[in-house]
């Protein structure tokens, strides 16, 4: 039995997504990944629309068994929190319209699942994801969001493995 898990690191300018294939007990492979890059010149409404359309296209091509997002956290700037929350809402809606369950994990929980420490740096997450899944290009400077998305998907694979395997 296999399972596809999609992690998404949401953003109003860049959203990373990563899909892993989970086979048997903890056998995890990278399936596909990418970054949705939006223009700061576009209105927020236009960016949300483009984010929705792009992630919908990915979900139509590859229907994962679960979508995983970071939990909402509060920025120092309340407007940033609201804007990010709206981007998350667009992503949740895209999954919900396809009856794909959505799960959330705090960033420190996802980091702990991959690096072993909840306060790991983005570079440490990139390095561990690269090594775990044998994807050297995730080490590129512009792939932090993709590495975070992989970390979320891996976190869910580890957290849900007992339910996935029918073990409690």
UniProtKB/Swiss-Prot annotation:
EC number: 3.1.21.10
GO molecular function, one term: magnesium ion binding
Localization terms from the record: Cytoplasm
Record HAMAP family: RuvC (MF_00034)
EC category: hydrolase
Main subcellular location: cytoplasm
InterPro entries cross-referenced by the UniProt entry: RNaseH-like_sf, RNaseH_sf, X-over_junc_endoDNase_Mg_BS, X-over_junc_endoDNase_RuvC
SUPFAM superfamilies attached to this UniProt entry: Ribonuclease H-like
UniProt KW DNA damage keyword: yes
Keyword Iron part of the UniProt annotation: no
Binding site residues for Mg(2+) 1: 9, 145
Biological process terms in GO annotation: DNA recombination; DNA repair
Sequence positions that bind Mg(2+) 2: 70
Domain of life according to the entry: Bacteria
Function per UniProt: The RuvA-RuvB-RuvC complex processes Holliday junction (HJ) DNA during genetic recombination and DNA repair. Endonuclease that resolves HJ intermediates. Cleaves cruciform DNA by making single-stranded nicks across the HJ at symmetrical positions within the homologous arms, yielding a 5'-phosphate and a 3'-hydroxyl group; requires a central core of homology in the junction. The consensus cleavage sequence is 5'-(A/T)TT(C/G)-3'. Cleavage occurs on the 3'-side of the TT dinucleotide at the point of strand exchange.
Protein's UniProt name: Crossover junction endodeoxyribonuclease RuvC
């Amino acid at each position: 039995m296999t399972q596809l898990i999609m992690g998404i690191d949401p953003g109003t300018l860049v959203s990373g997504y990563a899909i892993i294939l989970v086979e048997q007990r903890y056998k995890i492979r990278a399936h596909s990944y990418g970054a949705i890059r939006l223009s700061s010149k576009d209105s927020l409404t236009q960016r949300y629309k483009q984010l929705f359309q792009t992630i919908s296209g990915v979900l139509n091509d590859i229907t994962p068994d679960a979508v995983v997002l970071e939990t909402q956290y509060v920025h120092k700037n309340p407007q940033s929190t609201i804007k990010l929350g709206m981007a998350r809402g667009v992503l949740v809606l895209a999954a919900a319209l396809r009856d794909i369950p959505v799960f959330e994990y705090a960033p420190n929980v996802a980091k702990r699942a991959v690096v072993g420490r909840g306060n790991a740096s983005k570079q440490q997450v990139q390095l561990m994801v690269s090594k775990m899944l044998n994807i050297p290009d995730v080490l590129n400077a512009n792939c932090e969001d993709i590495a975070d998305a992989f970390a979320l998907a891996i976190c869910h694979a580890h957290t849900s493995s007992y339910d996935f395997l029918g073990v409690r």
